[in-house]
UniProtKB/Swiss-Prot annotation:
One of its GO terms (molecular function) is structural constituent of ribosome. Homodimer. Part of the ribosomal stalk of the 50S ribosomal subunit. Forms a multimeric L10(L12)X complex, where L10 forms an elongated spine to which 2 to 4 L12 dimers bind in a sequential fashion. Binds GTP-bound translation factors. One of its GO terms (biological process) is translation. Forms part of the ribosomal stalk which helps the ribosome interact with GTP-bound translation factors. Is thus essential for accurate translation. This is Large ribosomal subunit protein bL12. The gene is rplL.
Length: 121
């Protein structure tokens, strides 16, 4: 007669915490393993070196030429006149989020050419 996984899980669920700890210790001893999590060192550098692939374009100020910035916002986002005007006046505000590096650079150049101050994050 073989015990199924479900029967084992039910037995574990019925155990107290101390009984589970004793069971784990016995399993570690029997199989020569440890339940402690392995510590990996040096992993932080790999994450820091990973290149960012998505960027947010943030309008920080519309500058002196608000009309030109509103036109640039409309062409870049497809917004209507009222929405683009509200966006320009609400700076700092994200114009587009999670865009590629090339699209972010193009959008930044277009808005700066219109007189806006823009950050790419």
């Amino acid at each position: 007669m073989s015990i199924t996984k479900d029967q084992m899980l039910e037995a574990f669920a019925a155990m107290s915490v101390m009984e589970v700890v004793e069971l784990i210790e016995a399993m570690e001893e029997k199989f020569g393993v440890s339940a402690a999590a392995a510590v990996v060192s040096g992993g932080g550098d790999a994450v820091a070196a990973e290149e960012q692939t998505e960027f947010d374009v943030v309008l920080t100020s519309f500058g002196e030429n608000k009309v030109a910035v509103i036109k640039a916002l409309r062409s870049a986002t497809g917004l209507g006149l009222k929405e683009a005007k509200t966006m320009a006046e609400s700076s700092p505000i994200a114009v587009k989020e999670a865009v590629s590096k090339e699209e972010a650079a193009t959008l930044k150049a277009d808005l700066e050419a219109a007189g806006a101050s823009v950050e790419v994050k």
